[in-house]
Amino acid sequence: MSAPLLALDGVSKLYRRGLLDRTPAFRLDVDFRIDEPAIVGVMGPNGAGKTTLFEMIAGSNTPTEGRVMVAGHDMQRVRYRERDRLAIHYHQSYQVRRFPRTRPNFMLEPAGSSYPVVHLFDEPQFNTQDGYIGFMLDFFRRLRDERRLVFVCLHPTAALHLELLNEICERFFFVGGGAVRPFADFGTIVADADVRRYLGALAD
């Protein structure tokens, strides 16, 4: 049996208030696996941990506990410069965060892949002019058809954003309250009480 495309096994990330004040400030717990190619929608409030989730999958942010496995590879054991051959995080320049390396590169293993298996789109900008949206949706579908796993994270501020998620995504996650909750389809996620509170007037 082949390894899942992505598995987060008992993963948690804990941030503390500071070097001297070790009081927990934020915790995110994640546990799921995805075996088949798909386009996955991700929603959640600002500061809920969506970018932290993507950083852990891409291997730039080390989990406090647990393992992130991409196509059978433990991301924290893959050479730093080769991690984006397994999972690549597309984000805005203001989102880039630097994290210390936890072990020397010579102790790490090669990625074993020349093209990313997991593609993480963190709040992509959907330009409504000149067919750009259609181009992006076709790109996401092409990646899936090439047996890749695609995550599209949006913070909906307009009905268009929900329409795009409904059109392109086959399953969903909602990040909030320190957890990452799975939903089988668009109808299920927008019917959830927590999600409706988050969406506000867009849920009506």
Residue ranges and their predicted role:
Residues F174-A203:
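Conserved beta-strand-loop-alpha-helix hinge in the C-terminal portion
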Residues G66-D74:
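Conserved ABC transporter NBD signature motif
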Residues T64-R67, G177:
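Conserved coupling/switch loops of ABC nucleotide-binding domains, chiefly the family-specific signature
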Residues A58:
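Helix-to-loop junction immediately C-terminal to a conserved catalytic motif
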Residues F139-H161:
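Conserved catalytic loops of ABC-family nucleotide-binding domains
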Residues D74-I88, R98-P100:
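ABC ATPase NBD coupling module
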